[in-house]
UniProtKB/Swiss-Prot annotation:
Belongs to the UPF0354 family. This is UPF0354 protein MW1686. It comes from the Bacteria. HAMAP family: UPF0354. The lineage of its organism: Bacteria, Bacillati, Bacillota, Bacilli, Bacillales.
């Protein structure tokens, strides 16, 4: 399977939609947009092809479902009936777009040197990121959106599964409600887990649909955490960061874990980017 074959497969699977397609050969992306208002999404074909080797048709089904829901929610409609309980925070990488395709700034806040908090209107099976043009229709200020979203994310259930590896405990929050990574904003929940930890607490949001918390008690734990975050990061539909965060008393600090077999392979580009982001974040605070 190559990008051209994947392009054709997706176009065939999405032929029931009233959309147009625009293929960018150089960037290996496919933009899918509505014919009535030109709103749409852009997907990276090379990333899907890479996942296809492992997940086969399942990844295609996931993309088709995602596009179906996104295109449906991009229809022009009123936002006046939206309730406060539908305002939610979503976590994105700091490299995520700051504006819509039409050039309208999104409502977002810095979170860490690696992550940013965007805000969204929950629409059931999908959500729509809030931009400045929507504030008037929502009849909300940016501050009200922040407060509502944090209140709502704290109301989400925080069920998790655990796994123990060589004395280290790993917690996985994976409810697939679109806000698993957003639970990193629930300080009360993180503090609850921190109280149970016997070693160093690490937190990771490799992609939108998972939050990993680890109680690291030995060197093996760090290696496992590094492997987990990279594994989830490469397989997520909305990847965020492959780095973990140290957590202590409400404070998150991005860290770069060196695997035991890679001590001489410390990527200077990764370190340089992390340090640059960290300096910029601290300067702007």
């Amino acid at each position: 399977m190559n990008t051209f074959q994947m392009r054709d497969k997706l176009k065939e699977r999405l032929s029931h939609l009233d959309v147009d397609f625009k293929f960018n050969r150089e960037e290996e992306t496919l933009r899918i947009y509505r014919t009535d208002n030109n709103k749409g999404i852009t997907i990276k074909l090379n990333a899907i092809v890479a996942k296809y080797e492992d997940k086969k048709e399942k990844i295609v089904d996931e993309i088709v479902y995602y596009v179906d829901e996104a295109i449906a929610q991009m229809a022009d409609k009123t936002l006046e009936s939206i309730s406060s309980s539908q305002i939610m925070p979503v976590i994105r990488a700091t490299s995520f777009d700051k504006k819509t395709k039409q050039g309208v700034p999104f409502i977002y806040d810095e979170h860490t040197a690696e992550t940013a908090v965007y805000y969204a209107v929950d629409l059931g099976k999908s959500y729509r990121l809030i931009d400045e043009s929507m504030l008037e229709d929502l009849k909300l200020t940016e501050q009200q959106i922040r407060e509502m979203s944090l209140f709502n994310v704290r109301k989400l259930s925080n069920s998790y599964t655990t796994d123990e590896v060589k004395g280290n405990t790993f917690y996985f929050i994976n409810s697939n409600d679109g806000y698993d990574a957003s639970r990193i904003l629930n300080t009360a929940f993180l503090n609850e887990i921190e109280a149970q930890c016997q070693g160093e607490m690490l937190v990771a949001v490799p992609h939108q649909d998972v939050l990993i918390i680890a109680d690291i008690r030995n060197k093996t734990g760090y290696d496992v955490m590094a492997h987990l975050t990279m594994e989830f990061f490469t397989k997520g539909l909305v990847p965020i960061t492959s780095l973990s965060f140290g957590y202590k008393q409400g404070h998150l600090e991005p860290i770069f874990i060196l695997g035991k077999n890679n001590k001489q392979k410390r990527d200077p580009n990764v370190i340089q980017r992390l340090e640059a982001n960290r300096r910029k974040f601290n300067k702007d605070k």
